[in-house]
C-alpha cells in the first residue's frame, strides 16, 4: 500500500518539496472522501490547461493572500507530521442519508475558504511581510523624515492655503488625524471579539450596526452553502394566519368575495368553454373548477421544461387543491364577516345606549313639563274660582299681578308658550275695568300708571315688539290698553277744551312711556289734532285776548311736525291783522316773537318781508334828521325789530331810507363853518345807536367811513380860510381812532372764530375718548331736554330697549336702531334728536 498520503497536507496534495509530479493511484484517503461534498477540489488554472505538468507555480509573490492556495514560505521552520495510519474504508461509518432528514451544517463542513483562519504571526511570516500584517505599524512618526529635508511638501501646502493643525480643503473639511487602526485581541476571525470600531470611527460615524440584522444576514449566507440545496427534499413551509391577522385584513380591504344580495339572483351564461353553461349567480362562477379539456392531449396541456427544472409532477390533484383552497377562502371570509357582524353589533349596542340616554333625558323633560303644566293649571283654576261673583275672597288686581309674576318667573316656558291673550282677557280685563271705573284723567293724570307699568312687563309680547307689529290678537297688553284704558281717554277728550291745554298735556306726558306708540299716535292724530284744528279756525287775532301760542306751543314736544298744517292758517290770520298796523304799536312784536323759532326760517323771513319790513321802511322815511333838535322815536321803533328781522333786511332799510338823508345833513353842516367838535359828537352819537352786529356789516361800515372822508376833505379844503383851532387834529384823531376800532373788531372776530373752532375740536375729542355711544346719547338727550330711560324688562335680540322721547330704540355695536312700522331701522344721532323733538 502506498504511503504517499502521509506526506500530503490536509488538502490531499503532495508537498511542493517533492518532484513536480502527481500519483494517479487510488488511496484510502480517496476512498474515504469519495462522497464528501466538502472536500477540497483542485480547479485547473489557465496555465495548467495550457502547459499541463510543465506549468510552473508562481513563487515570486510572497505576500500573504486570502485565497485558498498559498505560496510556500521556505523561511518558516520545518513542521513534521507524526507517522500513523488513517482509518480504512472498512472501518468507515455509514454516511447518513441527507435526503431523509435535514441536519444543521457544522462549521467543519464549510469550505476551507469560509472558515476562520489563523493569522500568520511570529515565525510564519517572512521578514519582508511583518511590516504589513494587520496594519500594526504606528503612524506616530509619520512625516518625521521632513526634519532632515528641505520641507518642500510643507511649503507647497502652506502656499496653497494650508494651515497646520487644520484639515485640507477650501473649508478645512479634511480629516486632521490619520485613520486609526485597531489591533485584534486574538487570532480569531473578524468580529470574533466584538466590535472592532475605533474611537475615531465612533465619533465620525455614530450609527450603531444592528446585531440582529448581521445575524440574520449570516444565517442567510449560511443556508446557501448547504449540501445539494437543489436536489434535497426540503420540508414544506406552512403559512399560518391568525384570527387577528384575518380581522386586520378584513378591516383594511372591505370588499368580500361573498356575493352581494343584489347580485345573488343574476342569471349568467358562460360561453368560455366548449359547452354553454348557465349560472344563476356570480358566486357560482367563482366556484367553477379549472379542469383541463378532455380533447387536448396531455403533452399539449403541460408546458415542457428544460434542463434541471424538468421534473416529474409526482402526486398532483388540482381539483382537491382547488377545493381545499376554496374551503380556506370561505373560512376566511366567514371569519371576516363574523368579525364585522360582531363590530356592527357592538356599535349598535353603543348607539342604543346613547339613544337610551337621550330618551331618558326627553322623558325627564316631559315629566318636568307635565308637572309644571299641572301647577300652572291649578293656579289658573284658582283664579277662575275667585273670579266668581259669589266668591267670599274675590281676586284683586294686585293679587292677580303677583300670580302672573309667579307664572313668568317660575314657569316661564309654559307662560311663554301659553295663550296669554285669552288668559288676560278672561282674568285681567274685568279687574282692570273695575279699577278704572271712577277715573278722571284730567283731574288725576297719574292714576294707574304704576299698575299699568307692571302689567306691561307681564303681558307685552317681546317678539311682537321686536317686529314692530300692531296685531291686537297677538299682544295682550296692547289689547288691554285699547279695550280697557282707551275708552276713558276718548270720553274725556270729547269734553276737553283746547284752550285749556295744560291738563291734557300733563296727562299724556305721564302716560307716553307706558302706552304703546301706535296708541299714542292714534290719540294725537284722531282726538287731539282735530280739536286744535277746529279751534284755530275759530281764532281771531284782533278780538281774542288769549294769545294763540299759549295753547298751541305746549303741544310742540308731543306733536312736533303734526302741527305743521296749523301754521299756514295762523300766518294767514296774522297777515290779515297786520294790514293796518303801525310800528308804533308794540303788541305785534309780542304776538309774533313766540313764533320765530316755530316757523321754518324761510317761512318766517318771507312773513317778515311781506308784513313788517314795508311798515318799518315807511317809518324810516318819515324820520327827520335835525342836528339841533332831533326826534328819535321813529328810529327807535325800527331798531326795536332788529332781533325779529334779519340783519340784511335791516341794513337794506338803513341804506335806502336813513343813510342818504344822514350824509346830506352832514355835508350841509360842514359847508357853513361848523363847530367840528359838535360834528364829532354828532357822528359818534349816531354810531352808538347801532349794535355791533349791524356796524360789522360791510355796507354800514362803508357809510360811516364815507362820513369820515367827507369830514377830512372839509378840513383839508379850508387851508387859507379861518378854521377853528385844533379842528384838523381832532378830525384826524377821530379818523385814526375809528379805523383802529375797525381793525381791532376784525381781529377780535377772527380770534373768536379760531377759539370757537378750537373749542369744538377739543369738545369732540374729549367727548369721543372717555365715553361710549350710550353716554353720548344720554348727553345729547340732556342738552335737548329729551327723556332717555331704559324700558324695564324689555329686550330685542338680547339688547336693552330704551325710550328716547316718544321713540323706542336700542343700541347695537355703536349703532342706534329706531322702531319703525314693520322693522328696526338704523339712524344717525342727529336724525334721532330731530324725531324725538
UniProtKB/Swiss-Prot annotation:
G-patch domain: which residues?
A: 149-195
Which Gene Ontology CC terms are recorded?
catalytic step 2 spliceosome; chromosome, telomeric region; cytoplasm; extracellular matrix; nuclear speck; nucleolus; nucleoplasm; spliceosomal complex
Q: State the residue spans of region: Required for interaction with DHX15.
A: 1-50
Taxonomic superkingdom: Eukaryota
Q: Where is this region: Disordered?
A: 1-21, 53-72, 85-133, 179-236
Query: Which stretch carries the motif Nuclear localization signal?
Result: 700-705
Is Cytoplasm among the key words of this record? yes
User: Sorted alphabetically, which keywords does the UniProt record give?
Assistant: Biomineralization, Cytoplasm, mRNA processing, mRNA splicing, Nucleus, Phosphoprotein, Spliceosome
* InterPro entries noted in UniProt: G_patch_dom, GCFC_dom, STIP/TFIP11_N, TFP11, TFP11/STIP/Ntr1
Q: Name one GO biological process term.
A: mRNA splicing, via spliceosome
Q: Where in the cell is it found?
A: Cytoplasm; Nucleus
Annotated stretches, region: Required for nuclear speckle localization: 710-734
Please describe what this protein does: Involved in pre-mRNA splicing, specifically in spliceosome disassembly during late-stage splicing events. Intron turnover seems to proceed through reactions in two lariat-intron associated complexes termed Intron Large (IL) and Intron Small (IS). In cooperation with DHX15 seems to mediate the transition of the U2, U5 and U6 snRNP-containing IL complex to the snRNP-free IS complex leading to efficient debranching and turnover of excised introns. May play a role in the differentiation of ameloblasts and odontoblasts or in the forming of the enamel extracellular matrix.
- Cross-referenced PANTHER family, in alphabetical order? TUFTELIN-INTERACTING PROTEIN 11, TUFTELIN-INTERACTING PROTEIN 11-RELATED
Q: Which family does it belong to?
A: Belongs to the TFP11/STIP family.
Q: What is this protein called?
A: Tuftelin-interacting protein 11
Which gene is transcribed and translated to give this protein? TFIP11
Amino acid at each position: 500500500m502506498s504511503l504517499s498520503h502521509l506526506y500530503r497536507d490536509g488538502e490531499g496534495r503532495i508537498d511542493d518539496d517533492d518532484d513536480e509530479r502527481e500519483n494517479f493511484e487510488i488511496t484510502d484517503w480517496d476512498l474515504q472522501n469519495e462522497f464528501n461534498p466538502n472536500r477540497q477540489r483542485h480547479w485547473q488554472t489557465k496555465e495548467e490547461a495550457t502547459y499541463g505538468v510543465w506549468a510552473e507555480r508562481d513563487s515570486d509573490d510572497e505576500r500573504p493572500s486570502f485565497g485558498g492556495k498559498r505560496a510556500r514560505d521556505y523561511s518558516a521552520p520545518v513542521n513534521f507530521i507524526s507517522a500513523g495510519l488513517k482509518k480504512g474504508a472498512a472501518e468507515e461509518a455509514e454516511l447518513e442519508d441527507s435526503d431523509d432528514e435535514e441536519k444543521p451544517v457544522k462549521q467543519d463542513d464549510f469550505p476551507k475558504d469560509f472558515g476562520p483562519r489563523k493569522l500568520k504571526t511570529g515565525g510564519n511570516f517572512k521578514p519582508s511581510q511583518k511590516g504589513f500584517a494587520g496594519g500594526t505599524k504606528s503612524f506616530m512618526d509619520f512625516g518625521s523624515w521632513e526634519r532632515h529635508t528641505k520641507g518642500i511638501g510643507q511649503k507647497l501646502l502652506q502656499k496653497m492655503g494650508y494651515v497646520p493643525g487644520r484639515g485640507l480643503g477650501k473649508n478645512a473639511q479634511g480629516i486632521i488625524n490619520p485613520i486609526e487602526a485597531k489591533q485584534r485581541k486574538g487570532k480569531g476571525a473578524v468580529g470574533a471579539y466584538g466590535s472592532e470600531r475605533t474611537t475615531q470611527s465612533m465619533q465620525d460615524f455614530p450609527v450603531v450596526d444592528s446585531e440582529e440584522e448581521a445575524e440574520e444576514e449570516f444565517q442567510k449566507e449560511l443556508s446557501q452553502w448547504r449540501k445539494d440545496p437543489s436536489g434535497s427534499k426540503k420540508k414544506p413551509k406552512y403559512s399560518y394566519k391568525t384570527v387577528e391577522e384575518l380581522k386586520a385584513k378584513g378591516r383594511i380591504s372591505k370588499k368580500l368575495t361573498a356575493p352581494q344580495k343584489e347580485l345573488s339572483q343574476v342569471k349568467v351564461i358562460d360561453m368560455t368553454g366548449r359547452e354553454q353553461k348557465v349560472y344563476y349567480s356570480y358566486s357560482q362562477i367563482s366556484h367553477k373548477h379549472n379542469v383541463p379539456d378532455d380533447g387536448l392531449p396531455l403533452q399539449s396541456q403541460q408546458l415542457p421544461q428544460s434542463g434541471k427544472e424538468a421534473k416529474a409532477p409526482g402526486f398532483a390533484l388540482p381539483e382537491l387543491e382547488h377545493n381545499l383552497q376554496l374551503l380556506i377562502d370561505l373560512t376566511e371570509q366567514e371569519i371576516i364577516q363574523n368579525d364585522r357582524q360582531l363590530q356592527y353589533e357592538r356599535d349598535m349596542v353603543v348607539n342604543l345606549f346613547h339613544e337610551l340616554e337621550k330618551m331618558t333625558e326627553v322623558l325627564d323633560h316631559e315629566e318636568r313639563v307635565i308637572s309644571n303644566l299641572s301647577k300652572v293649571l291649578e293656579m289658573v283654576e284658582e283664579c277662575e274660582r275667585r273670579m266668581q261673583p259669589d266668591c267670599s275672597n274675590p281676586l284683586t288686581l294686585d293679587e292677580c299681578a303677583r300670580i302672573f309674576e309667579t307664572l313668568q318667573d317660575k314657569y316661564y316656558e309654559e307662560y311663554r308658550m301659553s295663550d296669554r291673550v285669552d288668559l288676560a282677557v278672561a282674568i285681567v280685563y274685568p279687574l282692570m275695568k273695575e279699577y278704572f271705573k271712577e277715573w278722571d284723567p284730567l283731574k288725576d293724570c297719574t292714576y294707574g300708571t304704576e299698575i299699568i307699568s307692571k302689567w306691561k312687563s307681564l303681558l307685552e309680547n317681546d317678539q311682537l315688539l321686536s317686529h314692530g307689529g300692531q296685531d291686537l290678537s297677538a299682544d295682550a297688553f296692547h289689547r288691554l290698553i285699547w279695550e280697557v284704558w282707551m275708552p276713558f281717554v276718548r270720553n274725556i277728550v270729547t269734553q276737553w277744551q283746547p284752550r285749556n291745554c295744560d291738563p291734557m298735556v300733563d296727562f299724556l306726558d305721564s302716560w307716553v312711556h307706558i302706552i304703546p306708540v301706535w296708541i299714542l299716535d292714534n290719540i294725537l292724530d284722531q282726538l287731539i289734532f282735530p280739536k286744535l284744528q277746529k279751534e284755530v279756525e275759530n281764532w281771531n287775532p284782533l278780538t281774542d285776548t288769549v294769545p294763540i301760542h299759549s295753547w298751541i306751543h305746549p303741544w310742540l314736544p308731543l306733536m312736533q311736525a303734526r302741527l305743521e298744517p296749523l301754521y299756514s292758517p295762523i300766518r294767514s290770520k296774522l297777515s290779515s291783522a297786520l294790514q293796518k298796523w303801525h310800528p308804533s304799536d308794540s303788541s305785534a312784536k309780542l304776538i309774533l316773537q313766540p313764533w320765530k323759532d316755530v316757523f321754518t326760517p324761510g317761512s318766517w323771513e318771507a312773513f317778515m318781508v311781506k308784513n313788517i319790513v314795508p311798515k318799518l321802511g315807511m317809518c324810516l322815511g318819515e324820520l327827520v334828521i335835525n342836528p339841533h333838535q332831533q326826534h328819535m322815536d321813529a328810529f327807535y321803533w325800527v331798531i326795536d325789530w332788529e332781533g325779529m328781522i334779519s340783519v340784511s333786511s335791516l341794513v337794506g332799510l338803513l341804506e335806502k331810507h336813513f343813510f342818504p338823508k344822514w350824509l346830506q345833513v352832514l355835508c350841509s353842516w360842514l359847508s357853513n363853518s361848523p363847530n367840528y367838535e359838535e360834528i364829532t359828537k354828532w357822528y359818534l352819537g349816531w354810531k352808538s345807536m347801532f349794535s355791533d352786529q349791524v356796524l360789522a356789516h360791510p355796507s354800514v361800515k362803508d357809510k360811516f367811513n364815507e362820513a369820515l372822508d367827507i369830514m377830512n376833505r372839509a378840513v383839508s379844503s379850508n387851508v387859507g380860510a379861518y378854521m377853528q383851532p385844533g379842528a384838523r387834529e381832532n378830525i384826524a384823531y377821530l379818523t385814526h381812532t375809528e379805523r383802529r376800532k375797525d381793525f381791532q373788531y376784525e381781529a377780535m372776530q377772527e380770534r373768536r372764530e379760531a377759539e370757537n373752532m378750537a373749542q369744538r375740536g377739543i369738545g369732540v375729542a374729549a367727548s369721543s375718548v372717555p365715553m361710549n355711544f350710550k353716554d353720548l346719547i344720554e348727553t345729547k338727550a340732556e342738552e335737548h331736554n329729551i327723556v332717555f330711560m331704559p324700558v324695564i324688562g324689555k329686550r330685542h335680540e338680547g339688547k336693552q330697549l330704551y325710550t328716547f322721547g316718544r321713540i323706542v330704540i336700542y343700541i347695537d355695536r355703536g349703532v342706534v336702531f329706531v322702531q319703525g312700522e314693520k322693522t328696526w331701522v338704523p339712524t344717525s344721532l342727529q336724525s334721532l334728536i330731530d324725531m324725538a323733538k
